[in-house]
């Protein structure tokens, strides 16, 4: 991850600069774990089964929404998932579709955004079978648009607020009058509606609305299938009407009326009719229906219910007669007509004959029971149908507002009945399925057309996809020429036999053979016919179709209603012109098929003028139970909805596409050149930013195409990888913040602990050093000391294995052997173990000293696993004495008062023997310490053994060890027995640069390498290496400011650091930042100058100037001989090997020659001859020696030849540097390959030194402010 330079950290929060509409990235708190794929175009395998499987996975995870591009797939959950709350609504407000999970709110937000941004009217087409959730989806879209368009924070007029409330109130009102409980759905829409919301073009707030009604199912008023219900309003009214209505309209419970009880379903689980009736009344009041209008509505509903209770008996002539005249009398009271006129209109039919233009005779023909029942039901259906139409028109009057005087920008919501297949299908089903065929046709056409237009507009190559065009089925139903369709055949049958319904049905059955001729989507059967719809094959019954197609009330009934004294009946519901249409013999009345055909075509024209959105709803089961998923049923819906073809069309070459700005908004975090700390920093245009992001993610060119305004991603796996990288970015940033915070807290704790320890040492002294001095006093003048024991940093810490910690190896040891006491001392060493018949052997052991006993623990491998066991347990009070030699060896004998075979004397070899003896003495003050040339102990109880110690300088003896053989220990000479530990040396800085451990979160990137620097005419000279804090600084030339590469103009630069009073600090910050940025920088060059010239810093590279005229110059004098150079510091030779294990020290091998720059007694500051390493070494290990003969180089190179008169010279400013470069180049060639390698090594070493020096300077300056935290995280 590249590090961008920035100034010193300020406590004042700095706002990120705004950039071209790209918002600062935010972590999505609401994002759920993805189950399946959220867009079906991202499926690896495209098939009906894979689509069904993906929908199943998401449904079981309560994720009911899935995309196909911009099409939303919704699976009805049959339960409240809590995903339509105010919190969810705000989550989708103003968000791009890619930023949030699939939801119906995302479709609504997209519609409203395009309306505002492009001024295009929008519509949403919601399709699916009955019970799939179309009405609920329409309600949620209305709820969302009403809320986002009327923002609470923006001042709105009372009229706009009223329009919003009325639009929302249409839902409960029309649901009560237009929805019913069916076998498949408890709230099935038995009509279609298209709601258009009109918006003000200036602020896009709703100012009006309009509802178009389609094909109410009138037949449901008079009859329902068993276990279904009539329209909701009848049950609401009969269960919850106020007492005044019960008294005035004679209303009783729903079980009283035939129309509400015949299907044997009065109550429905999950429906509260009383509560719904209260919402219906509230909706009426919101829309503006007056009390008189409401009374007339409920009076009409009561009359329909009582009409259904009119029953018939057969009289003496075999004609129908009223069974109970009180019922017809009460119906006449409700309709405010004469009771005899009502009975006559139901029981008789008036027939007029004509003779040409002359009026004929009039006949009153009595009806039988079947005919009278049909007349009764026709009256009830007619009243309800015209009442529903009037309610819709009355709502439109209230919603009209100011729409007529303004430019119309609308959002349309289509909620229409779904495809229906029943056991017996009649005229209602063919009309419903015809409308769904038209919607499927416009869906295919608009989807494919939009897809084709997009590829052409974006200049993207793609392959056309074959699909089923259902226009042939639509023509089968609606066509008039050249071959008439079903609707035309129905109308012709009515015209041929208008007086007899049975005869008209027979004529229609005969004409079916002509309708379906040569059409493979039609089959004619006796009394039935089959149409192969896109959703499946449906069998329709011929019987009754022609009668239902007439869609007109009998003239007798209309004439009876025109006599009503109620103006709502005779003028509003049944105006006089309605009767005039029936009496006009020159014009054929409009049939139901004519109306539905006209409405469907007008709907298609309206939708074609809008920018469409689509919601395809799916019903998961027939039992309406949550968490139940019928695979076969859903698979059938997936097939007939054409989801696979929709996916194939959408994925015609590319699985994902979006505009450049949205792509950048989503993924700019993935490139260090476009995103920094969550901010967008790219200065170029969006298309170049897209290319940079794809390049940083290493997406090959074959995986994407760039259009004119969109980027197209070919495979879903590419998008998945980028989304995964984006998710990891947030996790890595969170982890980085956590690390930085933990590091900050740890540093504070360490600093506090350091201050506390320093205060304790200052006040009470260092207890570990005091213990060390006490132990040294026990051996003072009696035993030679090892050099490592006399270090100033040596302290008696005791628990070297960490047994007192809660974890680690020491705790593991205690747990293995079952110890649970405080440990005073722990360490690893050896014991001398005697074997029968063989010489003694040194074996490794672990020593743990508690407050009461010394534990010797053995390590054994059992079945390749480490096992620890207590070998000896020696009570401290049982120790008689401890024996040590007078030499610098590590042997220690522990002799007991009464040794036993299980607890014998032991001979121990331990590096920290003096510390162990000290702790034993502290725990047992009466302990005797014997020091002599020999050590005596009992190998076995009663059998003493003596070990002799001799001093030897044989090279085979280790410097820091000894040799045991046959009871004799040979050891090298040690320090004087009177040696004292020096004062503890001052600790060196241990700051760490953490930035090198960071990698940008989630970005796929190869290992970064530093590119080679561009050649320069100046000779590169490394910056001086860092010096120790206590070392006197030598005088060096001031380094020249580095020259950077030309920056990328597209990347926005973070503001440079503020000017500092310390120039050296500023140079250090610049060098360190450039080093961490991995940019190409010119190494600072040593300026070779005359004694009368001043050094000048180079400026930015200027344009190339014309070459100067040739000037003849003499050759420069040869440089001084390198062999004559004197060393900067005295040279010393190492007499012994030193491992450099102490912090801040430097490792040495015997005979190494180093510089010594400082000596404080026991320790000396050493530096290697090439000045690449520096550290402390024991003064006792080194001795002064003359410098080596090859120090500083070998034979001086010969002077270069003088330049030719024709040779061009460089400008005067760089002339000396060029000469020096030439000199060094020739010298390097003369020295051969070894010299070149050595020069390369020195250059790398000095470069590292310059970076380290710069980092130290920057850290020192920052540490001067205690309030500031080190900036060691690169964002």
Swiss-Prot record:
SUPFAM superfamilies: P-loop containing nucleoside triphosphate hydrolases, SH3-domain
Positions that bind ATP: 128-135
Highest taxon above the source species: Eukaryota
Compositionally biased spans, kind Acidic residues: 1264-1275
Pfam families membership: Myosin_head, Myosin_TH1, SH3_1
Residues covered by the Myosin motor domain: 35-727
Localization per record: Cytoplasm, Cytoskeleton, Actin patch
Residues where Phosphoserine is found: 361
Biased composition (Basic and acidic residues): 1254-1263
Domain TH1: 785-974
Gene Ontology BP term (one): endocytosis
Biased composition (Low complexity): 1095-1106
GO CC term (a single one): plasma membrane
Keyword Isomerase: no
Region described as Disordered: 966-1064, 1089-1128, 1183-1230, 1251-1275
Keyword list, A-Z: Actin-binding, ATP-binding, Cytoplasm, Cytoskeleton, Hydrolase, Motor protein, Myosin, Nucleotide-binding, Phosphoprotein, Repeat, SH3 domain
Post-translational modification as stated in the protein's UniProt record: Phosphorylation of the TEDS site (Ser-361) is required for the polarization of the actin cytoskeleton. Phosphorylation probably activates the myosin-I ATPase activity.
Domain IQ: from-to ranges: 731-751, 752-777
Region (Actin-binding): 410-493
Domain SH3 as annotated: residue spans: 1127-1187
Biased composition (Pro residues): 1107-1121
Note on domains (UniProt): The myosin motor domain displays actin-stimulated ATPase activity and generates a mechanochemical force.
Similarity comment text for this entry: Belongs to the TRAFAC class myosin-kinesin ATPase superfamily. Myosin family.
Protein name: Myosin-1
Native organism: Meyerozyma guilliermondii (strain ATCC 6260 / CBS 566 / DSM 6381 / JCM 1539 / NBRC 10279 / NRRL Y-324)
């Amino acid at each position: 991850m590249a590090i961008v330079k920035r100034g010193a950290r300020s406590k004042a929060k700095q706002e990120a600069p705004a950039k071209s509409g790209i918002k600062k990235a935010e972590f999505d708190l609401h994002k759920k774990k993805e189950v399946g794929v959220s867009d079906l175009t991202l499926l690896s395998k495209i098939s009906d089964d894979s689509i069904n499987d993906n929908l199943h996975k998401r449904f079981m995870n309560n994720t009911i929404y899935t995309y196909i591009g911009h099409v939303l797939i919704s699976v009805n959950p049959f339960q409240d998932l809590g995903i339509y709350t105010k919190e969810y609504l705000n989550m989708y407000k103003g968000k791009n579709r890619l930023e949030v999970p699939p939801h119906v709110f995302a479709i609504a937000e997209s519609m409203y955004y395009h309306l505002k941004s492009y001024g295009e009217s929008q519509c949403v087409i919601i399709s699916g079978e009955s019970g799939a959730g179309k009405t609920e989806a329409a309600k949620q879209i209305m709820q969302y648009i009403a809320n986002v368009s009327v923002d609470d924070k923006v001042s709105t007029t009372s009229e706009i607020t009223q329009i919003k409330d009325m639009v929302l109130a249409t839902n409960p009102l029309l649901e009560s009058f237009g929805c019913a409980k069916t076998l498949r759905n408890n709230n099935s829409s038995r009509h279609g509606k298209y709601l258009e919301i009109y918006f003000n073009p200036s602020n896009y707030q709703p100012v009006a609305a309009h509802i178009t009604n389609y094909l109410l199912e009138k037949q449901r008023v008079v009859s329902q299938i068993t276990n279904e219900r009539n329209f909701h309003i009848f049950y609401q009214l009969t269960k919850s009407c106020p007492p005044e209505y019960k008294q005035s309209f004679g209303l009783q419970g729903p079980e009283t009326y035939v129309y509400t009880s015949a299907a044997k379903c009065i109550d429905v689980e999950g429906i509260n009719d009383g509560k719904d009736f209260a919402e219906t009344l509230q909706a009426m009041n919101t829309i503006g229906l007056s009390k008189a209008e409401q009374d007339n509505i409920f009076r009409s509903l009561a009359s329909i219910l009582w009409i259904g209770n009119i029953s018939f008996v057969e009289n003496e002539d075999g004609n129908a007669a009223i069974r109970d005249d009180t019922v017809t009398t009460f119906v006449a009271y409700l309709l405010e007509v004469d009771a005899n006129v009502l009975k006559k209109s139901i029981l008789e039919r008036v027939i007029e004959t004509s003779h040409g233009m002359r009026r004929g005779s009039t006949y009153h023909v009595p009806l039988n029971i079947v005919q009278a029942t049909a007349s009764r039901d026709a009256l009830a259906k007619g009243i309800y149908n015209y009442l529903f139409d009037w309610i819709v028109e009355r709502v439109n009057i209230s919603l009209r507002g100011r729409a007529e005087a303004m430019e119309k920008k609308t959002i349309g919501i289509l909620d229409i009945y779904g495809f229906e297949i029943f056991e017996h299908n009649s005229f209602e089903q063919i009309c419903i399925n015809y409308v769904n065929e038209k919607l499927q046709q416009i869906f295919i056409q608009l989807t494919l057309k939009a897809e084709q237009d997009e590829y052409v507009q974006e200049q993207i190559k793609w392959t056309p996809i074959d699909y089923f065009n259902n226009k042939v089925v639509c023509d089968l139903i609606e066509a008039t020429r050249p071959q008439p369709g079903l609707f035309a055949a129905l109308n012709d049958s009515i015209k041929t036999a208008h007086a007899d319904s049975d005869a008209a049905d027979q004529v229609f059955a005969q004409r079916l053979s002509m309708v379906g001729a040569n059409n493979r989507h039609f089959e004619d059967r006796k009394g039935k016919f089959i149409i192969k719809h896109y959703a499946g094959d449906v069998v329709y019954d011929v019987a009754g179709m022609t009668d239902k197609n007439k869609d007109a009330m009998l003239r007798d009934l209309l004439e009876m209603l025109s006599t009503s004294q109620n103006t709502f009946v005779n003028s509003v519901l049944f105006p006089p012109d309605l009767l005039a249409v029936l009496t006009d013999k020159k014009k054929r009345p409009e049939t139901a098929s004519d109306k539905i055909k006209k409405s469907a075509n007008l709907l298609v024209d309206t939708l074609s003028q809008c920018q469409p959105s689509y919601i395809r709803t799916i019903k998961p089961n027939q039992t309406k139970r949550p968490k139940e998923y019928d695979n076969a049923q859903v698979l059938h819906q997936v097939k007939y909805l054409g989801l696979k073809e929709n996916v194939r069309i959408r994925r015609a070459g590319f699985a994902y596409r979006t505009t450049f700005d949205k792509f950048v908004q989503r993924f700019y975090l993935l490139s260090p050149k476009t995103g920094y700390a969550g901010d967008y920093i790219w200065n170029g245009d969006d298309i170049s930013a897209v290319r940079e992001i794809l390049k940083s993610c290493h997406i090959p060119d074959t995986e994407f195409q760039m259009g004119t305004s969109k980027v197209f991603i070919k495979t879903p796996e590419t998008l998945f990888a980028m989304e995964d990288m984006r998710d990891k970015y947030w996790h890595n940033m969170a982890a980085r913040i956590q690390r930085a915070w933990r590091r900050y807290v740890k540093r504070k704790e360490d600093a506090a602990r350091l201050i506390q320890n320093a205060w304790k040492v200052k006040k009470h002294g260092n207890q570990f050093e005091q213990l060390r001095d006490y132990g040294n006093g026990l051996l003072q003048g009696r035993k030679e000391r090892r050099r490592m024991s006399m270090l100033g940093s040596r302290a008696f810490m005791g628990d070297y294995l960490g047994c007192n910690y809660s974890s680690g190896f020491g705790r593991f040891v205690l747990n293995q052997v079952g110890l649970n006491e405080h440990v005073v001392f722990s360490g690893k060493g050896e014991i001398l173990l005697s074997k029968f018949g063989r010489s003694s052997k040194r074996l490794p052991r672990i020593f743990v000293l508690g407050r009461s006993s010394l534990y010797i623990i053995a390590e054994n491998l059992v079945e390749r696993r480490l096992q620890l066991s207590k070998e000896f347990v020696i009570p401290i009070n049982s120790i008689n004495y401890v024996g040590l030699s007078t030499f610098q060896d590590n042997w220690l004998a522990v002799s007991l008062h009464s040794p036993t075979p299980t607890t014998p004397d032991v001979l121990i070899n331990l590096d920290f023997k003096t510390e162990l003896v000290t702790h034993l003495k502290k725990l047992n003050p009466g302990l005797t310490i014997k020091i002599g040339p020999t050590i005596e102990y009992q190998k076995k109880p009663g059998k003493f053994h003596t070990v002799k110690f001799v001093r030897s300088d044989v090279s085979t003896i280790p410097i820091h060890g000894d040799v045991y053989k046959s009871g004799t220990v040979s050891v090298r000479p040690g320090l004087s027995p009177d040696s004292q530990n020096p004062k503890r040396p001052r600790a060196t800085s241990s700051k760490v640069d953490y930035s090198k451990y960071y990698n940008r979160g989630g970005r796929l990137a190869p290992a970064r390498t530093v590119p080679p620097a561009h050649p320069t005419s100046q000779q590169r000279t490394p910056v001086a290496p860092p010096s120790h804090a206590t070392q006197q600084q030598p005088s060096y030339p001031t380094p020249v400011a580095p020259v950077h590469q030309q920056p990328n103009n597209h990347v926005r630069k973070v503001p440079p650091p503020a000017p500092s009073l310390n120039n050296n600090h500023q140079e250090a910050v610049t060098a360190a930042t450039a080093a961490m940025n991995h940019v190409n920088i010119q190494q600072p060059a040593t300026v070779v100058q005359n004694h009368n010239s001043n050094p000048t810093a180079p400026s930015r590279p200027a344009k190339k100037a014309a070459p100067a005229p040739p000037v003849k110059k003499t050759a420069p004098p040869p440089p001084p001989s390198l062999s004559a150079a004197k060393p900067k510091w005295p040279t010393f030779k190492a007499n012994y090997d030193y491992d450099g294990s102490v912090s801040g020290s430097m490792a040495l091998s015997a005979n190494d020659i180093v510089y010594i720059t400082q000596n404080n007694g026991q320790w000396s500051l050493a530096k290697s001859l090439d000045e690449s390493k520096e550290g402390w070494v024991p003064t006792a290990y080194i001795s002064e020696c003359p410098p080596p003969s090859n120090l500083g180089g070998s034979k001086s190179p010969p002077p270069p030849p003088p330049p030719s008169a024709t040779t061009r010279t460089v400008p005067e400013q760089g002339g000396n540097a060029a000469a020096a470069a030439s000199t060094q180049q020739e010298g390097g060639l003369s020295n051969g390959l070894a010299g070149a390698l050595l020069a390369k090594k020195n250059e790398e070493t000095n470069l590292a030194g310059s970076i380290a020096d710069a980092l130290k300077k920057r850290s020192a300056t920052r540490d001067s402010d205690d309030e500031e935290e080190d900036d060691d995280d690169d964002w």
